[in-house]
């Protein structure tokens, strides 16, 4: 298909079904690749628009797209959203009764469905039957990191998905994830037999604030959380806890204070968990206190904050969980509580896991993030392989910056030692070389003959540990945990070595008990007028009524962003209504007159006749 036709077709689909005028970075290029029959690995942050990358090709291409998803709740949310946009979609899973399944199969066979969502087990079992007898436009593997043992959420049922290529050699496969480091990405490509491009979007979420609070007793943490929620009146939020016991305790304490909170964990029945999730989606519960299982299956755009009551097990988990907040692009706050008790408990979990070495390394990096005095956003971006050369200016560390000094020579000494040792040493051996210590590893490999041996003996071991951690977090080298923790100099590190880039390191000092919390910077400084705020509330109430009538969560009817724009612009005609962000042709026809009528009604009441 000619490029110009593809561009026109996909732009029309984006406007008509989703109400967007422009694609986000990488979306259009990914869609074109899939429509040309090519495989893709897509890395985009949560809320970055991954689903559009396979949904638009599914609408444009003949046949049915098969979407593999790990959670039934995730499938259900996405199918409901597609239906609300006028797109023929269905889910095939254990929740279907025999009648539902028969109807869905018939719709597949007749070509009526554009997308069908399945679990990995269901896909494998149906390959000889349903999927061998229908025209498949593409396969989309969501949460693709689950296929890799190097990933943070390995799921054995995903490991069979490599057979897709054997049975459907000419059908494009698009694998998508929000969290995968370089090693995990390589493993995904290998396991799924992908032979196309890899697209990596920016992992930066500038609308999220990042804060860490160290230590604190149970009562101090609860007091802070209560004050925090009172500072976010009516805003939906999630509190992640390490144990079921803590989810119940935190929810109970908040309810005592009059906050509408609910606990969510694996100890609840399937029906109880589904009820909590549904009430949260429908804005009937403000706060969910949950173990890590919660949130993966939710596409709720107006979560305004996330608190981690305990330290997460990895940066991947942390990034994915804070990604539940601010999916609509508006400012959102994230706070992480951190204590050594969490580290000890998580270490015991890692020791007992089947991937001890990998999990211990990931926990170590998470602990380093929590203890860091380097810009937190910079740490996250560098961890995921995205070069970040400047501090963000609005995390808690940047808001209260520590004292720094010119550390260029120190960094050059350390990186020179790494290079001269063939990039095969781990951090401990690097320190031995710099300090001039004849450790067994140094003697065995003749590292004491290197020019850099003893070049850093004027600094203590603990000083070098701190400086090397800063260098790692600033992205001057990376740790290859699949090569026994070998240090590898990055392109940014080479620039420092060549004298092309100066470096400021944090001056060592006693650790403070706590870094103050900052709030999300506002994406827009424009304050809504009182009249706009009043109209927004009226429109939000109308949206809730429409959602309840249809059994949808309110955000599926219209997003908060669309409501804010409606309250600000006050469209007078159906054409103007259809130009609002997030309102496609289907929603324009379905809801236009209803919302316009409410806007006119409010205008009359305020004396603004038109």
Predicted regions and their residues:
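Flexible coil/turn residues that form the inter-helical turn or adjacent wing/linker of helix-turn-helix
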Residues: 169, 233, 373, 423, ...
């Amino acid at each position: 298909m000619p490029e110009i036709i593809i561009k026109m077709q996909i732009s029309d689909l984006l406007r008509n079904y989703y109400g967007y005028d422009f694609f986000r970075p990488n979306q259009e290029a990914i869609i074109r690749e899939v429509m040309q029959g090519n495989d893709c690995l897509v890395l985009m942050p949560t809320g970055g628009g991954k689903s559009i990358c396979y949904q638009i090709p599914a609408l444009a291409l003949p046949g049915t797209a098969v979407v593999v998803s790990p959670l039934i709740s995730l499938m259900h949310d996405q199918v409901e959203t597609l239906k609300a946009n006028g797109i023929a979609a269905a889910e095939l899973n254990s929740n279907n009764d025999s009648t539902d399944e028969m109807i869905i199969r018939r719709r597949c066979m007749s070509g009526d469905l554009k997308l069908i969502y399945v679990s990995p087990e269901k896909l494998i079992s149906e390959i000889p039957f349903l999927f061998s007898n229908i025209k498949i436009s593409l396969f989309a593997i969501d949460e693709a990191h689950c296929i890799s043992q190097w990933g943070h959420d390995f799921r054995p049922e995903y490991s069979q998905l490599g057979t897709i290529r054997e049975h459907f050699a000419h059908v494009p496969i698009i694998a998508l994830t929000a969290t995968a480091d370089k090693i995990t990405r390589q493993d995904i490509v290998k396991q799924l037999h992908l032979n196309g491009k890899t697209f990596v979007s920016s992992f930066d979420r500038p609308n999220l604030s990042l804060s860490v609070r160290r230590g604190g007793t149970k009562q101090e943490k609860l007091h802070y959380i209560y004050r925090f929620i009172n500072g976010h009146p009516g805003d939906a939020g999630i509190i992640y806890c390490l144990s079921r016991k803590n989810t119940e305790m935190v929810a109970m304490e908040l309810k005592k204070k009059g906050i509408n909170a609910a606990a969510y964990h694996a100890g609840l029945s399937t029906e109880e968990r589904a009820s909590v999730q549904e009430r949260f989606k429908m804005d009937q519960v403000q706060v969910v206190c949950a173990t890590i299982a919660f949130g993966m299956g939710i596409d709720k755009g107006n979560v305004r904050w996330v608190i981690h009551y305990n330290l997460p097990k990895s940066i991947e988990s942390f990034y994915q969980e804070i990604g539940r907040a601010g999916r609509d692009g508006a400012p959102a706050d994230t706070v992480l509580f951190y204590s050594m008790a969490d580290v000890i408990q998580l270490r015991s979990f890692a020791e007992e896991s089947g991937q001890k070495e990998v999990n211990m390394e990931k926990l170590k990096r998470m602990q380093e993030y929590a203890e860091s005095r380097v810009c937190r956003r910079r740490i996250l971006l560098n961890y995921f392989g995205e070069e970040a050369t400047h501090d963000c200016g609005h995390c808690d560390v940047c808001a209260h910056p520590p004292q720094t000094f010119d550390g260029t020579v120190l960094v050059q000494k350390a990186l020179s030692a790494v290079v001269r040792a063939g990039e095969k040493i781990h951090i401990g051996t690097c320190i031995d070389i710099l300090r001039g210590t004849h450790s067994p590893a140094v003697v065995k490999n003749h590292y004491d003959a290197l020019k850099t041996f003893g070049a850093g003996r004027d600094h203590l071991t603990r000083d070098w540990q701190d400086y090397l951690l800063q260098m790692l977090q600033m992205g001057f080298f990376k740790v290859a945990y699949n090569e026994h923790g070998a240090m590898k100099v990055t392109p940014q590190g080479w620039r420092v070595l060549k004298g092309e880039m100066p470096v400021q390191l944090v001056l060592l000092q006693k650790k403070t008990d706590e870094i103050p919390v900052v709030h999300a910077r506002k994406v827009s400084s424009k304050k809504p007028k009182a009249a706009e705020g009043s109209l927004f509330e009226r429109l939000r109430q109308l949206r809730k009524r429409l959602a309840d009538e249809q059994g949808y969560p309110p955000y599926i009817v219209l997003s908060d962003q669309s409501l804010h724009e409606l309250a600000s612009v006050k469209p007078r005609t159906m054409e103007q209504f259809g130009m609002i962000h997030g309102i496609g042709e289907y929603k324009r026809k379905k809801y236009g007159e209803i919302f316009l009528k409410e806007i006119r009604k409010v205008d009359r009441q305020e004396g603004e006749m038109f």
